[in-house]
Every structure is written in C-alpha cells, then in structure tokens.
Amino acid sequence: MTVTGTIEKKGFGFGTWALVTDDGTTYELKDAADELKQEGIKVEIKGKIREDVMTMAMIGAVLEVESYKLL
C-alpha cells in the first residue's frame, strides 16, 4: 500500500514516530529510516500493514516501511 501524510512524534516517554494521512488516519511506523524521524515533514510511504505486531503506543495500525519519498 502507498500512503501520503505528515510525520508526527506520538506518545509518552521516548514516543514513537507516526504517519498521519490527509484524511486523519494514523499509522505507527516500523523500520523507519532516520530521515523519516523529523516531525512535520510531508512524505509518501510504501509499505505493508503488520497485523502480527503489537506495540505499547497503540496509536494505529503498524506500517512497515518498505520505501519512501519526501514531498
């Protein structure tokens, strides 16, 4: 799947990196490159939803990043 949105830091403590799409859907990023760990950047991410992965953040579906493009 390919989704477009804005990177945000979510949660308490160390937090987690998330992609918030233009329609408001939030995905927790898995295996995000350091370049993606910048709050407020607009990106297009290609990846797959990992239904077999649970996290402490529980902010949305886990999106395993396969590739990305800064917009």
Language-model regions, residue ranges each:
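Short nucleic-acid-contacting surface segments enriched for D/E, G, S/T with interspersed K/R
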Residues: 32-46
